[in-house]
């Protein structure tokens, strides 16, 4: 169910980014770079992700 939600939201974001890219190429470059960075961070910290979501870090 969680995986389905992630897939659906990524498809929605892809469509949104495509529409923005058509009208604002510079913004499109920034967003695509941001998405790539977030994806890499997610893949690196995948093991910690569920722990952080379940138990927010208290400072």
UniProtKB/Swiss-Prot annotation:
<feature type="transmembrane region" description="Helical">
    <location>
        <begin position="25"/>
        <end position="45"/>
    </location>
</feature>
<feature type="topological domain" description="Extracellular">
    <location>
        <begin position="22"/>
        <end position="24"/>
    </location>
</feature>
<keyword id="KW-0472">Membrane</keyword>
<keyword id="KW-0732">Signal</keyword>
<dbReference type="GO" id="GO:0016020">
    <property type="term" value="C:membrane"/>
</dbReference>
<keyword id="KW-1043">Host membrane</keyword>
<keyword id="KW-1133">Transmembrane helix</keyword>
<feature type="signal peptide">
    <location>
        <begin position="1"/>
        <end position="21"/>
    </location>
</feature>
<feature type="topological domain" description="Cytoplasmic">
    <location>
        <begin position="46"/>
        <end position="59"/>
    </location>
</feature>
<keyword id="KW-0812">Transmembrane</keyword>
<protein>
    <recommendedName>
        <fullName>Uncharacterized protein ORF59</fullName>
    </recommendedName>
</protein>
<dbReference type="GO" id="GO:0033644">
    <property type="term" value="C:host cell membrane"/>
</dbReference>
């Amino acid at each position: 169910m969680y995986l389905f939600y992630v897939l659906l939201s990524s498809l929605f974001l892809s469509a949104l980014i495509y529409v923005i890219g058509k009208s604002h190429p510079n913004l499109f470059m920034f967003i695509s770079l941001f998405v790539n960075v977030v994806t890499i961070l997610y893949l690196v910290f995948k093991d910690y992700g569920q722990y952080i979501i379940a138990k927010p870090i208290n400072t």
